[in-house]
Amino acid sequence: MKNIMKLASIALVLLFTLFGLTNKASAAKLTLYCSVEIDVCEMLEQAYEKETGTKVAMTRASSGETFAKIKAESSNPKGDVWFGGTGDPHLTAAQENLTAEYKSKHFNDLLPAAQNQAVNANYKSVGIYVGALGFGYNKELLAKKGLPAPKSWMDLTKPIYKGEIQIANPNSSGTAYTTLATIIQIFGEEKGWDYMKALHMNINTYTKSGSAPIKATGRGENLIGICFQHDGVKQTKKGLPVVTVSPEEGTGYEVGSMSIIAGARNMKEAKKFYDWALSPPIQTMVFTSGKSLQVPSNTKAQADPDAPDLSTINLIDYNFKVYGDKSTRAGLLSKWDNDVSVIPR
């Protein structure tokens, strides 16, 4: 009898162990590639895990780096969703069939710019937020150096600002690529490249991340940082002496985007996250947290009261379809590499 009871106990232990292992193995998973600020990425990761029980593996990298990663992994995709970063590389990814078609149930509630992003990408991407381009300067450092406050794109090419400006590298940064595309659209092809060469002479560092220049400006390590305006305002909200500028000539803007990676291993979970991230409660959570000051794409979501008011900014008619085209993008980056970045400063 004792042997029978002992065998029964062992069988029960094995059964529960097997059940636990099976249950663990079948737990939902999601691999998230995230191209917004790390604190927002972590907030999304933790909130989704808590709400759904899904185990999220998140990697944070700039939009250019993430695009390159997805392209390199295309024969054996490892990611499921790409969240954030400027819309241009998302459009390029869609054109190269690196992302999958999916139309969210929240589509009709989105801003026109976010819907246009989806249409231009054949529903292989969608807009999740909107943010205007600009630059910021450290007002304390400006006063110390006795320099005038810059107000326009052209001001940034003046010799008085030599060695005083930072911008990211457009090969790795969506912010910098948007800047390049904006300048070409404002000034035209020939004058636009002349502008980029003149700006290059005033750059002290090309960073990898688009938000790094304005962070350095906030810390007093750099005078002027070219950035999205919400990133400048974020530094000011932290109590740092940053003044954000909307250039007088007008400026471009981003439609920060999200895409499902083609061949995603967890496609069902990817679509679930996609809808979740576009829902009013989640967009309100993200964009009123103080960690992200862009304008949310869902019209039923709330924005942070300190987010830049796009209606007061002179936004150009940015051509996302043209500048998100893979050949246009490759051509601009190649010309910048060969004709601008190599000029001795």
Labelled PLM ranges:
Residues 27-92:
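Early extracytoplasmic/lumenal segment of secretory-pathway proteins
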Residues 35-42, 78-221:
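Extracytoplasmic ligand-binding site segments that recognize negatively charged/polar headgroups
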Residues 88-92, 218, 223-241:
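A ligand-binding cleft/hinge motif common to bilobed small-molecule-binding domains
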Residues 100-109, 125, 154, 240-252, ...:
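Short beta-strand->loop
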Residues 136-141, 181, 255-266, 285-288:
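A bilobed periplasmic-binding-protein/Venus flytrap-type ligand-binding module shared by bacterial periplasmic
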Residues 195-200, 206-207, 238-262, 299:
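Periplasmic-binding protein-like
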Residues 261-320:
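Mature extracytoplasmic/periplasmic domains
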Residues 318-345:
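Conserved C-terminal helix/tail region of periplasmic/extracytoplasmic solute-binding proteins
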